Swiss-Prot record:
<keyword id="KW-0805">Transcription regulation</keyword>
<dbReference type="GO" id="GO:0046983">
    <property type="term" value="F:protein dimerization activity"/>
</dbReference>
<dbReference type="Pfam" id="PF00319">
    <property type="entry name" value="SRF-TF"/>
</dbReference>
<dbReference type="GO" id="GO:0045944">
    <property type="term" value="P:positive regulation of transcription by RNA polymerase II"/>
</dbReference>
<feature type="domain" description="MADS-box">
    <location>
        <begin position="1"/>
        <end position="61"/>
    </location>
</feature>
<dbReference type="InterPro" id="IPR002487">
    <property type="entry name" value="TF_Kbox"/>
</dbReference>
<keyword id="KW-0539">Nucleus</keyword>
<keyword id="KW-0238">DNA-binding</keyword>
<feature type="compositionally biased region" description="Polar residues">
    <location>
        <begin position="213"/>
        <end position="224"/>
    </location>
</feature>
<dbReference type="InterPro" id="IPR002100">
    <property type="entry name" value="TF_MADSbox"/>
</dbReference>
<dbReference type="GO" id="GO:1900458">
    <property type="term" value="P:negative regulation of brassinosteroid mediated signaling pathway"/>
</dbReference>
<keyword id="KW-0804">Transcription</keyword>
<dbReference type="GO" id="GO:0005634">
    <property type="term" value="C:nucleus"/>
</dbReference>
<dbReference type="Pfam" id="PF01486">
    <property type="entry name" value="K-box"/>
</dbReference>
<dbReference type="InterPro" id="IPR050142">
    <property type="entry name" value="MADS-box/MEF2_TF"/>
</dbReference>
<protein>
    <recommendedName>
        <fullName>MADS-box transcription factor 55</fullName>
    </recommendedName>
</protein>
<feature type="domain" description="K-box">
    <location>
        <begin position="109"/>
        <end position="199"/>
    </location>
</feature>
Length: 245
């Protein structure tokens, strides 16, 4: 029994049309990929949906295949002088124009949006790991994950302590170097200062200063004190004598 041939016509329902387009597009790209692999052929497909969305497939590089087609068409034009070559070249230019049009830009925006979503997921995961390193949101972790986190924290602590010790040693070395420089500067300034005599004039002892006649000041003061005491004694005798009848 012969298979009934199905009539090909435009699908009226937009939803059904979109579903059919997606299925047929995947099948078309699959056949193109099989052709490229089985026959070692360069295959390029460009499809625009009714909404202007671009879909393309290339077994190698799309631009390289288009350039190859352009070169081949020009060579055929030189040999056969076919008038359709100019039309083919115009179609290639038009295809590249569409490739750089809004549909292609929309595709690039979709790719960038996908990359942005991936980066946001990575950022959220890194933020969660950072909070867990601070001891937050540990409820969902298993024992093995907690042990691994403990090892990571211990390794990080060892690196921090090692770095701190290295910085301490560098600061100590810097202080020692500055101390040596100050000592050298002190010696240089001391060498530049004039020599001051250390033996000065002797300070006289006031208690043992000699007078002009060779007597010391102590002996002179003793003599004066004794003389004054004798004068006081004489005066007292005179006053006593005058007072008697």
């Amino acid at each position: 029994m012969a298979r009934e041939r199905r009539e090909i016509r435009r699908i009226e329902s937009a939803a059904a049309r979109q579903v059919t387009f997606s299925k047929r597009r995947r099948g078309l790209f699959k056949k193109a990929e099989e052709l490229a692999v089985l026959c070692d052929a360069d295959v390029a497909l460009v499809v625009f949906s009714s909404t202007g969305k671009l879909s393309q497939f290339a077994s190698s590089n799309m631009n390289e295949i288009i350039d190859k087609y352009t070169t081949h068409s020009k060579n055929l034009g030189k040999t056969d002088k076919q008038p359709s070559i100019d039309l083919n070249f115009f179609l290639i230019i038009l295809l590249r124009t569409y490739t750089n049009s809004y549909a292609y830009i929309h595709l690039l925006l979709q790719l960038e949006h996908s990359k942005c979503s991936s980066l946001n997921e990575q950022l959220a995961e890194a933020s969660l790991q950072l909070r867990q390193m601070r001891g937050e949101e540990l409820e969902g972790l298993s024992v093995e994950e907690l042990q691994q986190m403990e090892k990571n924290l211990e390794a990080g602590l060892q690196r921090v302590l090692c770095t701190k010790d290295q910085q301490f040693m560098q600061e100590i070395s810097e202080l020692q170097r500055k101390g040596i420089q100050l000592a050298e500067e002190n010696m240089r300034l001391r060498d530049q200062m004039p020599q001051v005599p250390t033996a000065g004039l002797a300070v006289p002892d006031t208690e043992n200063v000699l007078t002009e006649d060779g007597q010391s000041s102590e002996s002179v003061m003793t003599a004066l004190n004794s003389g004054s005491s004798q004068d006081n004694d004489d005066g007292s005798d005179i006053s006593l004598k005058l007072g008697l009848p």
